[in-house]
């Protein structure tokens, strides 16, 4: 398995409080160099984005989070390190899957920010196949 996929599936810190989320996003804005910005609705990038593009996108993501995630808590941002992040997963508020987090095919984060070149996580973990029926689900047919 690749180091990117290993990192993607590794341990992350869930950012629960809005205050912590804002601090993380500000930290990213203040350290905008050498980031790969992967919007999983598009192809995985092969180059890092400029600092200007990175900051612009973080601000857009911040707007989406604050306008569309009307909760008292954040809970949809994950990072490998709060102080010196090198990998951040951000889920779109309108694509959270099952709220209990135990679905067979958990949702893919929409935005993946990393210091290492990304791989196509949609190809690797992509959308689930169509369900075949009640019995098939339990028998894994």
Positions of predicted regions on the chain:
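A contiguous binding-surface segment within folded domains or other stable secondary-structure elements
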Residues: 36-56
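Generic secondary-structure microfeatures
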Residues: 41, 58, 80-82
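Short, well-ordered helical secondary-structure segments
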Residues: 41, 45, 63, 98-100
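Polybasic, proline/glycine-rich intrinsically disordered low-complexity segments
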Residues: 13, 20, 29, 85-141
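N-terminal "first-domain core" detector
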Residues: 1-43
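Short, surface-exposed beta-edge/turn micro-motifs
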Residues: 32-35, 71-75
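Canonical SH2 domain fold
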Residues: 65-66, 72-80, 85-93, 98
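Short linear interaction motifs
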Residues: 50-70
